[in-house]
Amino acid sequence: MSEQQIDWDLALIQKYNYSGPRYTSYPTALEFSEDFEDAAFLQAVARYPERPLSLYVHIPFCHKLCYFCGCNKIVTRQQHKADQYLDALEQEIRHRAPLFADRHVSQLHWGGGTPTYLNKAQISRLMTLLRENFHFNTDAEISIEVDPREIELDVLDHLRAEGFNRLSMGVQDFNKEVQRLVNREQDEEFIFALLNHARDIGFTSTNIDLIYGLPKQTPESFAFTLKRVTELNPDRLSVFNYAHLPTLFAAQRKIKDADLPSAQQKLDILQETIVSLTQAGYQFIGMDHFARPDDELAVAQREGVLHRNFQGYTTQGDTDLLGMGVSAISMIGDGYMQNQKELKRYYQQVDERGNALWRGITLTRDDCIRRDVIKALICNFRLDFNAVEQQWGLHFAEYFAEDLQLLSPLAKDGLVDISEKGIQVTAKGRLLIRNICMCFDAYLRQKARMQQFSRVI
């Protein structure tokens, strides 16, 4: 089977298109508890002291509200609010950094919100703060999310001078009517200029985000967006399924249900996306992601060493992830932790305690085993029973007897091939990888929570 081959089977896609987790973690965030306290955090930090460190910093501010957005953000044009936020971040960074004094940072990512909401002086202040408090590898990956409406070319130069070497840009759709209906109108020519300039000044990796399922999108209109994106030629592409949840996200109430594409249209758009991007030379990595065949994500997947965390797919698997800022999530040791998600409470707690720890979970042995199984399937589309048995001292067929029974109907439908040695996800199964992973999710079996997740397609 070709590494990027997907066998589009509409009947199977419709059969299995029910709600499920995205598995940026296992257990998922639904299992986080507010009983998780500082002592558990410190225990997690001490678990694997030899691991390199990946840093995530959340910048929640945006100048404008995008109606589709479900992120943790604060829409304001009052720039001084960013200074107040940086004051709190400084407290948190100075409180957390000594715990990782012997670690080296191999990865830093700024997400949001809109990280480029910060002006040049604020960007420099935060980078200086991070470099003063953490030990960065000379070849560290330093990435940032960019809104093309909220950046000038000289800011890109400033980011590069501050050490940023990777760029992710939210484009979503090139169609003007779609942009207007989601309150995200942008200059197409400037997007091309921005990406080309990023390459010219030494950004080594570029990513474009698209969203399908937005109001007034059609397979025909999105085909134009795909054509323009392949002309942009980024190293990576993320094509997300829009989840319309107006009861959860107030901004989405501005989107009329009648304007949304039908379920069949969304499937048509997805099929068109996969065909167009693979014909343009991109490899389907999984879930929503595509990459050039020579991109390190694609290479890692072919070698069976791709990983996944709260930030998506990564080649850096054996690292601890420390998240800082409001709502930021960490993956440290055998635990997951999340900061306060309301800004007022974040400020209050950082001021009182130096950190903003809100909730988390310490993984059990069973959690860790299932985490490894799900990660192998979702990242590399295959699972070696012997590798799991050797690492965890168990007999796979016995330990996962119930799970393999749940997987059996999916095997009969041709989504996976199960042998004595392992599981291989087929070309039909790649699009439905979440369904396959759900067979190994013990928490789903305990609770009827299916309605809390987005549909798999």
UniProtKB/Swiss-Prot annotation:
UniProt GO BP: porphyrin-containing compound biosynthetic process; protoporphyrinogen IX biosynthetic process
Effect of gene knockout: Cells lacking this gene accumulate coproporphyrinogen III under anaerobic conditions.
Annotated keywords: 4Fe-4S, Cytoplasm, Iron, Iron-sulfur, Metal-binding, Oxidoreductase, Porphyrin biosynthesis, S-adenosyl-L-methionine
KW Cytoplasm (keyword) present: yes
Gene name tied to this protein: hemN
Subunit structure: Monomer.
GO CC entries: cytoplasm
Positions with a binding annotation for [4Fe-4S] cluster: 62, 66, 69
Taxonomic superkingdom: Bacteria
Identification of the protein by name: Oxygen-independent coproporphyrinogen III oxidase
Catalytic activity: coproporphyrinogen III + 2 S-adenosyl-L-methionine = protoporphyrinogen IX + 2 5'-deoxyadenosine + 2 L-methionine + 2 CO2
This protein's pathway: Porphyrin-containing compound metabolism; protoporphyrin-IX biosynthesis; protoporphyrinogen-IX from coproporphyrinogen-III (AdoMet route): step 1/1
